[in-house]
């Protein structure tokens, strides 16, 4: 809960920070928050210190969840942008998997009778192994910091700051052609110069404000379509269906594997199939699977349905979700908004997303108890309908379009 609170706080200032100081500097700051959090959790001397360390880590998560896909979008060639931004979601998925495996190994090590002396190593990795589990996050955090040191600043942000020569140099590294780089620089400058100078004035222009509202809507609606309920409460839901604790945990491992493998597939097809088609197919499959999961909980006893029925449609739901909204959401949010207010607008959408995550996390146990599992999954299915309507009616297909082309679309609305 502490990390989630920190994440909500982080997204609030991530966009403004990245718009003012640059994408690279903001990611470096987030990496420092990660590192301090991991080390702080490992050596904390009190519960209050642990809470503070977790909140700091959450702030870093919130910042990176906005700025990383934003940066990838701004340094990507249009025809590969969807694939490259989707790598962010893949990295998150693999990060979760890596954390699960690392924690499992640490727990196994601590229970194996290993002795690391009587000092702090024994405390962190054996007697109080939770310190090692939380502290290990400082390793990828420091690696992230080092990697970001060597990447270029976003060329579109550099144009916004009138650093045309530096921007041209970055475009040349991206396009490997001086002529293409010069053309992209001129197109970016043309669009930026047509924007209002005041960020808030520009954000409140009818077309741009519409894009911001749409982004926030799909961000929060996506959380109420059940994905985090499945990922957070999967074992409890499986036990509710009659599986033993061990079988429930094994089923959740299968959920995680399907999520990871499907995300890899999404990375390779998102620029070929298109963002909107993936949403149409994926969300339609989600509705079907959610209805059948609800059907199982309502009629499994009277019809004698096996537990494998539930497991199959759980996995099918995760497949449909991972190949559509999970892969597409950060791609759309990172390319929908104009350069001048991209960070600010993504912060608004990110805030909606994290608030939705928090609400679903808090409400799911209540819904499972009071609405019953059948009613809960029926509600998730109903929430898919406005999502797919918004994507169908209000969002343009952005596949293969430059960020400047997308910006012109919204400015004309």
Spans of model-derived segments:
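Alpha-helical transmembrane bundle of multi-pass membrane proteins
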Residues: 1-166, 170-171, 192-413
């Amino acid at each position: 809960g502490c990390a989630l609170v920190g994440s909500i706080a982080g997204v609030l200032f991530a966009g403004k920070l990245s718009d003012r100081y640059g994408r690279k500097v903001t990611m470096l700051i987030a990496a420092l928050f990660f590192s301090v959090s991991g080390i702080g959790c490992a050596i904390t001397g009190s519960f209050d210190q642990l809470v503070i360390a977790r909140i700091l880590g959450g702030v870093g998560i919130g910042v990176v969840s906005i700025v990383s896909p934003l940066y990838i979008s701004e340094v990507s060639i249009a025809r590969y942008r969807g694939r490259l931004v989707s790598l962010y979601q893949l990295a998150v998925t693999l990060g979760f998997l890596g954390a699960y495996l690392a924690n499992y190994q640490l727990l196994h090590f601590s229970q194996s009778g290993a002795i690391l002396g009587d000092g702090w190593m024994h405390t962190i990795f054996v007697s109080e192994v939770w310190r090692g589990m939380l502290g290990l996050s400082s390793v990828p955090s420091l690696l992230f910091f080092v990697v970001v040191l060597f990447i270029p600043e976003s060329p579109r942000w550099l144009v916004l700051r009138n650093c045309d020569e530096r921007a041209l140099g970055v475009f040349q590294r991206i396009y490997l052609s001086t002529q293409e780089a010069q053309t992209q620089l001129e197109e970016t400058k043309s669009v930026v110069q047509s924007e209002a100078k005041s960020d808030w004035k520009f954000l409140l222009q009818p077309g741009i404000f519409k894009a911001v509202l749409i982004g926030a809507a799909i961000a929060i609606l996506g959380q109420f379509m059940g994905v985090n309920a499945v990922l957070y409460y999967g074992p409890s839901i499986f036990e509710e269906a009659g599986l033993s604790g061990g079988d429930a945990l094994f089923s959740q491992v299968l959920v995680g594997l399907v999520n990871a493998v499907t995300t890899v597939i999404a990375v390779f097809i998102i620029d070929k199939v298109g963002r909107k088609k993936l949403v149409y197919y994926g969300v339609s499959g989600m509705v079907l699977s959610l209805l059948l999961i609800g059907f199982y909980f309502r009629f499994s006893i009277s019809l004698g349905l096996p537990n494998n029925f539930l497991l199959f449609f759980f996995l099918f739901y995760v497949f449909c979700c991972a190949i559509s909204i999970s892969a597409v959401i950060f791609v759309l949010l990172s390319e929908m908004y104009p350069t001048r207010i991209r960070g600010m607008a993504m912060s608004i959408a990110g805030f909606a997303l994290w608030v939705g995550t928090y609400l679903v996390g808090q409400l799911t146990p209540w819904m499972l108890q009071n609405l019953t599992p059948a009613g809960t999954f029926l509600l998730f299915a109903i929430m898919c309908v406005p999502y797919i309507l918004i994507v169908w009616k209000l969002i343009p297909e952005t596949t293969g379009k430059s960020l400047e082309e997308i910006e012109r679309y919204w400015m004309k609305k």
